[in-house]
Amino acid sequence: MRKLIRKAVGWGVATSYVLSGCRRRQLAAYGMNGAVLSVFGHNPRPIVLDSLLGWLVRRGFRFISTDELLSVRDGKRAWEPQTAWLTFDDGWAGFERGLLPILERYQVPATIFVAPMETERGKIWTNSVMGLTCEWHKWYDLPADERYSKVDKVLAENAGKVRQLADKDELCRLSQHPLVTLENHTYTHLSCSHRPVDEVVDEALETQRVLAEWTGRTPRLMCYPFGHCTDETDNAIRELGLIPVSSFPGRMTWGSIGKCRNMFHDAMGLYENVGRVLQAWPRVNVHMA
């Protein structure tokens, strides 16, 4: 019954949005600020991604690659209304088998933000322990070696050895696909607002090196894990020549690519996810200062 109610509410939000003219008014507003719809997820079930992309494509949205997004940002190509940008965090296992065929069918490019150490370990540290200990939220402030020591201890005690993330080989194959781009997500999925600037910079540089070695291409974007950073960190990342991808709407006017964290849910139905997308209308601002 709950599922039916959620589906009905989601359908109502989506339908009323389209029929009420809100869609036209919001798209007109996009024409004034050059915004791009940001569709963002982690590890969606294939049917979830398929239904959401299909809904958007059928309503006239055209998904652009990171190269195209940066061309618009830099004024090398004109912005077009109903433009969208699809991104995924972390690079979860099964992407190649489960999600790539959907991208190919709709010809939708996607950007995956990768933390190489987490790829090597096979897990995102928060996801692997949050159900096993109530102490995990205190570990954001710890340096990587101490944090991993605590994570490994909890996993060993709970026999938590299942791989969650795609391995290096899968990511390398994905990076060679014309629809897929890999970008920087720090080296250890670091909380950039909890650790010193120098540590964040070191992780950014190490990720640049590793991903260039894996893929033959040096990343241009860096997405902050957990969506947080400090002003000092943000400035330091820019000085490296990287373009920050931020979760803070306020940063959209600071020369970064502001990627709102009102993401679609990995396991929700179509109309629930359409409701999430339309309520917040996440966007990236491509008119940079």
Residue spans of the language-model regions?
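Membrane-embedded segments
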Residues: F95-L99
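C-terminal active-site subregion of NodB/CE4 polysaccharide deacetylases
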Residues: M1-T87, A93-G94, H177, H194-A289
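Metal-dependent polysaccharide deacetylase catalytic core of the NodB/CE4 family, i.e.
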Residues: V39, Q82-T83, E104-C229, G258
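Short, glycine/acidic-enriched loop or turn micro-motifs at the edges of active sites
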Residues: W92-A93, T188
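Aromatic-lined substrate-binding rim segments of carbohydrate-active enzymes
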Residues: P81, D89, L100-E104
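Active-site flanking residues adjacent to catalytic metal/cofactor-binding acidic residues
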Residues: F88-D89, N184
